A protein has these predicted regions:
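Noncatalytic, basic helical substrate-engagement surface that gates or grips nucleic-acid strands
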Residues: 1-138, 144-161, 254, 259-274
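Non-catalytic nucleic-acid-binding/docking modules located in mid-to-C-terminal regions
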Residues: 41-52, 67-75, 80-81, 107-110, ...
Length: 318
């Protein structure tokens, strides 16, 4: 099971109203582990990877488009907590995030957090390094659809639905292999990446039915098709007018071959090969007492993590 860490944490942070002993919000912590318990119950994984955005992780994509992720509003609580100021909330949010990382450090769970590397790219490398292993990506982000194959699935908690190759084709008439290409024409408002005017996924699928095939379609093939159109529509002209924009979008959106150094790939390979097997329940219980998260029933999660710990230790000794 491969988890998009911030995606899960922010959902927990906004939804769970829990408070700690000092009256400060702790929903990001408590909610994250409630979600983790549910995910472990439903997926029964033998390994869990949490992937986080590393420091300065947006630099590479912002070098292509300086507006990448610009204008995003900070994640805020959807409820009031007395005299908690915006600055107090920001500090609390960061503390909760760091605390989740500390909890995970005591569990048989691998975390990937590398300078200049976004979680999306780390997840892509994980999938490429484990081609023959059944794995489920946990994220609401549709960017991961492009990584789906016979052994790779995407679970979107917001809709409580799992995508496989067949579901993607049935819903979008686009094969996962060509999903990033199609989205490059459409853009991604969540990352502040505009697309060609008047172009949507449904239109792309209708005008270019070859996108439904497993065969990789090239950006140049779509552009050339528009250039050679005998009776071009506004749709075709819009694409041709936005050619550079679309190319830049694709360079940022595609996860098939993330632009990562050999050193970064080796770090991720090392994390896979040296999966953490330790499970420090004593430290976890101390943290739970400090944060007031002990009233959440950890029994089921602990039992599942204990099994992962035992299995990992056996494999590490082989």
């Amino acid at each position: 099971m491969i988890i998009d860490g911030l995606n899960l944490f922010f959902r927990a942070y906004m939804m769970d109203p829990s408070l700690g002993p000092n009256g400060q919000p702790t929903g990001g912590i408590k909610g994250a582990f409630k979600m983790l318990q549910k995910l472990v119950r439903e997926n029964n994984p033998d390994k869990i990877f949490f992937c986080w955005d590393g420091p300065k992780s947006s630099i590479r994509r912002r070098a292509i488009n300086s507006n990448y992720k610009e204008g995003r509003k900070p994640v805020r609580l959807n409820r009031n907590f007395g005299d908690l100021t915006e600055e107090d909330e920001k500090k609390n949010r960061y503390w909760q995030y760091a605390r989740v990382v500390e909890y995970l450090n005591e569990m048989p769970i691998a975390q990937i957090y590398i300078d200049f590397v976004e979680a999306d790219d780390a997840i892509s490398v994980l999938c490429r390094e484990l081609p023959n292993v059944k794995k489920t990506i946990i994220s609401n982000d549709k960017d991961f659809i492009q990584l789906l194959d016979a052994n790779t699935f995407l679970y979107r908690p917001c809709k409580e639905e799992t995508y496989d190759v067949e579901k993607v084709i049935n819903e979008f008439n686009i094969h996962p292999t060509n999903f990033a290409l199609a989205r490059a024409f459409v853009g991604d408002a969540s990352d502040n990446l505009p697309g060609a005017k008047g172009v949507g996924l449904k239109t792309m699928a209708k005008r270019f039915p070859e996108l439904k095939e497993e065969k990789t379609i090239l950006l140049t093939e779509i552009i050339d098709s528009c250039k050679n159109e005998a009776k071009p529509l506004a749709f075709h002209n819009s694409i041709l007018e936005s050619e550079k924009l679309i190319k830049d979008n694709y360079d940022m959106m595609q996860l098939y071959a993330p632009s990562l150094s050999i050193g970064v790939r080796e770090k991720i390979r090392d994390i896979i090969d040296n999966y953490p097997a330790s499970f420090n329940k004593t430290n976890l219980r101390k943290m739970m007492l400090e944060d007031g998260t002990g009233n959440f029933s950890w029994t089921e999660l602990f039992a599942n993590l204990n099994m992962i710990s035992i299995t990992s230790k056996v494999k590490n000794e082989q």
